[in-house]
């Protein structure tokens, strides 16, 4: 049986399609910045795709493929029971109670940006796809850390696949981005490489394949890799996927020329610089303890009620105040949620190690700027002929 459908409009819940940015700023100011940052970046990515001349169809297809495949993945994993392990904060524009408008834009960003950036390298198909996965993870990682810290979403408290975390971000989340984006890129690249003109048939085939197969092939990779950590994502599995992907990329790099920028790539270079600078600035300028997230969360109820999935993994069905370990609290509310509540308010917690979190986000930001500027031709004086 499926979990409650993510597209269920849930009239019994106090959600709104539109919320005043001023009202949201009072509760979660950093989230308002993050929401409109991603919407703006996705719009810039579309403008970039549209300005690609004879390569317009290829780039616009990449944009829409990322939007559709990414959103489909999100909906699938919200719908599946005992995979359903994350809940988004209420944004100023909501599509459903669980899906803010900005989330499809997030998928566009961490899938379109690395896909087209790696196209400039002219790598062979498999190394090209795996480098796209690594670059996608680099784009996503600082957002994964900042968003969790400032309660832009909440995680299931006892779900084994997301239990192992680095700076508050599940290792499983990092591995998912690497494998999902790499799979998406491989499928998309193989389809468009066979039809550079990108006919209508190619568009339909590419959209169908990336939407239908990316998540499935990602799950196959994840299932194999996480056996290194006893069946759940962990440090060994993360190191293994990084090493395998990096080795394949290195083997193909010798056959690739230096990245060649295309007209219009300057907008992507500027966008990544703004993005990778904005997230460290959010860490510096805002206090997570002042953030209040009233939204859907893990259902509140009795402690230690077990639920078991088809793989045999167990987790506690409910969140309970007496025994949970998440980066939020109930300190700002007058009373705890009623048993069975799926909509309630949680309060951000102060930094426990601000220097570590800051170093992680700033380091990823600096590395991200360097990698993307290199891939997009921003670190070379002679740009040569336009790339793909």
Which stretches of residues belong to each language-model region?
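Aromatic-rich, lipid-facing transmembrane alpha helices and their immediate juxtamembrane interface loops
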Residues: 1-388
């Amino acid at each position: 049986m499926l979990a409650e459908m993510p597209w269920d409009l849930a009239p019994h819940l106090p959600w709104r399609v539109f919320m005043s940015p001023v009202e949201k700023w009072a509760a979660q100011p950093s989230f308002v910045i993050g929401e409109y940052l991603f919407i703006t970046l996705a719009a810039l990515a579309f403008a970039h795709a549209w300005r690609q001349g004879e390569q317009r169809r290829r780039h616009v297809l990449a944009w829409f493929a990322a939007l559709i495949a990414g959103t489909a993945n999100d909906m699938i994993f919200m719908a599946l029971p005992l995979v359903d392990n994350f809940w988004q904060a209420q944004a100023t524009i909501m599509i459903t109670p669980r899906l803010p408008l900005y989330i499809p834009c997030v998928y566009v960003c961490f899938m379109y940006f690395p896909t087209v950036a790696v196209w400039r390298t002219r790598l062979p198909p498999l190394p090209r796809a795996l480098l796209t996965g690594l670059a996608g993870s680099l784009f996503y990682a600082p957002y994964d850390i900042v968003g969790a810290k400032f309660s832009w979403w909440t995680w299931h408290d006892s779900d084994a696949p997301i239990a192992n975390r680095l700076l508050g971000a599940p290792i499983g989340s990092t591995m998912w981005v690497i494998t999902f984006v790499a799979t998406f890129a491989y499928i998309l690249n193989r389809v468009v490489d066979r039809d550079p003109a990108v006919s209508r048939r190619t568009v339909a085939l590419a959209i169908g394949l990336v939407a239908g197969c990316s998540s499935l092939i990602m799950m196959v990779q994840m299932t194999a890799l996480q056996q290194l950590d006893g069946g759940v994502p962990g440090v060994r599995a993360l190191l293994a996927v990084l090493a395998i992907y990096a080795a394949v990329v290195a083997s193909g790099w010798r056959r690739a020329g230096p990245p060649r920028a295309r007209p219009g790539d300057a907008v992507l270079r500027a966008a990544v610089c703004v993005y990778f600078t904005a997230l460290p600035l959010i860490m510096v300028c805002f206090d997570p303890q002042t953030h209040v997230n009233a939204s859907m969360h893990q259902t509140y109820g009795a402690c230690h009620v077990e639920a078991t999935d088809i793989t045999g993994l167990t987790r506690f069905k409910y969140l309970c105040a007496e025994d949970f370990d998440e980066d939020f609290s109930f300190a700002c509310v007058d009373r705890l949620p009623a048993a069975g509540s799926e909509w309630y308010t949680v309060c951000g917690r102060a930094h426990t190690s601000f220097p570590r979190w800051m170093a992680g986000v700033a380091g990823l930001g600096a590395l991200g700027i360097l990698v993307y500027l290199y891939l997009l031709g921003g670190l070379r004086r002679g740009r040569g002929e336009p790339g793909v």
